[in-house]
Amino acid sequence: EMLQDAARQKASDIHMLPALNGFKVSFRIAGHMVDVTHEHFFPASQVENVTNLIKLMDDSRNVDVMRTNMPNEGSFYLHRGSQDIFIRLETLPVGSDGQEKINLRLLPQAGRTQSTKKTLDSIGYIPEDLDAIKSVLYRNATGMFLNSGPTGAGKTTSLHAEIHYVLDSVQEPLNVIEIAEPIEIYEDDFTQVQVRKAANEALNLTAEKILVASLRSDPDIILYNEIRNSTDATVAMQASNTGHRVFSTVHAADCTRTISRLLDFDISKTTLLSELKLIISQRLVATLCPYCSKPHTLTEKERRLLTPREMEQVEGRLREKGSAADIQACPHCNHGYSGRTAIAEYVIFNTEIRDALLHQRSFGEIQEVLSKNNFRSMWEKGIDMAMQGKIELDELIHVVGK
C-alpha cells in the first residue's frame, strides 16, 4: 500500500528511518521531503519484520537479510496498472542495535511504446536552449556529449532523451550500447550492460572492461554511465575519436566546474577539446501550482542575495506555495507543486571556445571564456522562471544556488 501510494503521488524516493516509536516515513515529492508517517505507520514492534520483508523483495540477489551491520544495495519491480516501476533499494545501518534505514528510489519505466518515452521537448528546457541543443545533436556525427549535475538532477533521463532525438533524426536503426551502474531506464532498442562486482576480483565486469569490449561491437552510439577519472575520459575520447557518438555524465555542479574537472585529468587537452561537442548542466526544480500559489514578498535575506538589477526584475512578480488550507482544497496539485522541470545551462564547443580554453585552466579564466560567448547560467534562467511565477525564489536558491 505504501509503495502504491508513493507511485500515485509521483514520489521519487521513500525514506524509512527507525525511531523510538517506529519508522518515520517520508516521501520525496517534487524534490521536497513530505512526512507521511501518519498515513503509513509502522510501530516499533514491526520495524524488524518490515525491514526484512522489504529486503526479501530484492530481485538482484545482492541483499542479505541477515546482514544488518553493513549497507545493502538491491532492486525490484513494482507493477502498477500498465506501468512498471523499477525500485532501487538501499539499506544503511543506524545506531548500535542492528536497525537499518531504508531508502527506496522509484524509477518509472517508459514502457514499450515510443510515445511514452521521455523526449527533449518534455524535459522542460526553455525554447532557445532546446533549439540550440537539438542543433548540435543533429549536426555532429561523432564526439562527446556530456551531462553534469548532482545525483537526482535528471542526467540519465536527459541523456536518453538526447539519444532518442538522434535516433528520430537519422530515421534508421543505430547500434546503441549503454554501460550502466545500475541500469535505471530499460530500453528495448539499446544493448544495455550492467557493471557487476564478483567475489573474485578478476571476474569483476567493470565499466572500463565493458567500454573496451563495446568498441569492438560495431557501435554507433555509446552511453557511458559516468566519466570519473582519466582512464574513463581517455577511453571515451578514443571512442569518439574513432567515429562514434559518446554520451556520458560527470558529477560536477555546473558547466564551469565540469570543464575544470575534465581539464584537470591527465589527458591531452587538445584531444579532449576537439572531441567535446556539448556539455549540459542541470537541476530539477519544483514548479508551483498555478491554481493555489500566492504572491511572495521578498525577505531581507533574499534582498541581500539579489543584485539591484535582479531586484528590479522580480519585485512584485514572485509567487510562493499557497497556504496549507489552500493546498489541501486544491484539486489540481500535489502539495502545492504541479511537478518538476529542468533548469539547464550549456556550452556548445566551437573553435573560439576551444582555442580560448586551450590556454586557460583556472576557474575564473574558464568563466571569463564562457561569458564572452553569451553563456547564461542556471541562476540567470532561474531568475526568469521565478519572475514568471513558475518557481519559488527560495526553491531556486536552495536547489541551484548563487
Model-derived segments and their meaning:
Residues 20-22, 33, 83-84, 92-96, ...:
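Conserved nucleotide-binding/hydrolysis micro-motifs of P-loop NTPases
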Residues 121-135, 309-402:
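NTP-binding/hydrolysis catalytic cores, primarily Walker-type P-loop NTPases
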Residues 14, 87, 136-137, 181, ...:
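Residue-level signature of catalytic and energy-coupling elements of molecular machines
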Residues 143-147, 160-286:
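Switch/coupling sub-region of P-loop NTPases
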Residues 1-4, 48, 52-56, 131-135, ...:
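Solvent-exposed alpha-helical segments within well-ordered globular domains of core cellular machineries
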Residues 1-153, 157-158, 383-402:
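N-terminal "pre-motor" subdomain/linker immediately upstream of P-loop NTPase catalytic cores
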Residues 252-351:
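Cys/His-rich Zn2+-binding cysteine-cluster or related metal-binding knuckle/ribbon modules and their
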Residues 5, 9, 53-64, 92-94, ...:
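Conserved, well-folded catalytic cores of nucleic-acid-processing
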